[in-house]
Amino acid sequence: MKHGILVAYKPKGPTSHDVVDEVRKKLKTRKVGHGGTLDPFACGVLIIGVNQGTRILEFYKDLKKVYWVKMRLGLITETFDITGEVVEERECNVTEEEIREAIFSFVGEYDQVPPAYSAKKYKGERLYKLAREGKIINLPPKRVKIFKIWDVNIEGRDVSFRVEVSPGTYIRSLCMDIGYKLGCGATAVELVRESVGPHTIEESLNVFEAAPEEIENRIIPLEKCLEWLPRVVVHQESTKMILNGSQIHLEMLKEWDGFKKGEVVRVFNEEGRLLALAEAERNSSFLETLRKHERNERVLTLRKVFNTR
């Protein structure tokens, strides 16, 4: 049984949950989940957790994402995308210079209102379910960050660009906000998620077309996941204690990367096995001071233990 992360490709049409179901069916395991919804009309990278890999999905939801999007100026739909009912069509008498200026004005932080039709929850219910029942919930705006925008291409009313965003940013809302700034509204007509953190569309796998063996072979093992997090190595004899829930004291550590208090670190044994994720109680720079004064204090607090054998 493999545990880890699969970089899946979601084609246009299926839901993110459909991708999860396909992996469950082909790998014959129930423990499968995804790390961030991708709209049915969109395609691209969908991070899938398999078995104990489902327990680290929260760390993928916090990563930057890159999208390619095409929007149509002057078209307004109830969902902010091409699948929704058309609410209004307007003339959009603006120059290319004005379009570019409006697009680039969103680089940086801004308060974004989530679309009424989205997978976001309100009192335990998905917004899109409430909207279909005629219950439109106006959520408060959320501060999001647009890190950069590039590859802007303008062909009449259709405008495409690439954008790198913070987690929780709705590209549909960004398109509509750009459209409103231009005075004509806009709707996303094509959307591709090109990357999630370090994982790109080039390495993604279409699970609907892949055989079970290929899917299994493409699972990234836990030991190679979350490589952006600091790493510590404990002495081999500490393995059993940590797997049984013992907190990590200084004497257990053999070596470590630099980390700050409050950071999550990956805990390995000398065999290279990932034992746990833990939260740092101290800055790593202070550990040598503790060692010098022979103070065997707790330095890491367990967050998740991975007993995969």
From Swiss-Prot:
Sequence similarity: Belongs to the pseudouridine synthase TruB family. Type 1 subfamily.
Alphabetically ordered keywords of this record: Isomerase, tRNA processing
Protein name from the UniProt record: tRNA pseudouridine synthase B
Function, in words: Responsible for synthesis of pseudouridine from uracil-55 in the psi GC loop of transfer RNAs.
Record: active site: D39
HAMAP family, per the entry: TruB_bact (MF_01080)
Reactions the enzyme catalyzes: uridine(55) in tRNA = pseudouridine(55) in tRNA
GO MF terms, alphabetically ordered: pseudouridine synthase activity; RNA binding; tRNA pseudouridine(55) synthase activity
Species whose genome carries this gene: Thermotoga maritima (strain ATCC 43589 / DSM 3109 / JCM 10099 / NBRC 100826 / MSB8)
EC number, UniProt record: 5.4.99.25
GO terms classed as biological process: mRNA pseudouridine synthesis; tRNA modification; tRNA pseudouridine synthesis
Keyword DNA-binding: no
